[in-house]
Amino acid sequence: VLTYGDLVTDLKAYAADKRWRKEVGGIVVNGVPIATDDRSKQMIMGARLAAEADPNFTTPWVANDNSVHTLSAAEVIAISNAVLAHVAGCFATYATVAPQIESGAIAGAAQIDAAFG
């Protein structure tokens, strides 16, 4: 027998998985598909540190579709900012969805899917 508590736990786990999949699913910044998995986020942060230290910094970057782009310091910083905004948006959506699951306002996976877009 599935209890309400089981349903809430299952829906919260589903929402957490949905958040994670969206977070690591990648984004497009100025036409360049950017990977947002944990390794890629570390590489982006490293490039950002170099870009902040040297405004003339450039680096070849392999995009999520395997195309190669030479990025300037400003482009690296813009990509880093976009990735941060993407991740923060995923967390913000989950922070809105989780209490709605607990309150019963969200009672199914379709509502969670809709919240995450």
Please identify what each model-predicted range represents.
Residues 1-117:
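A preference for well-ordered globular domain cores
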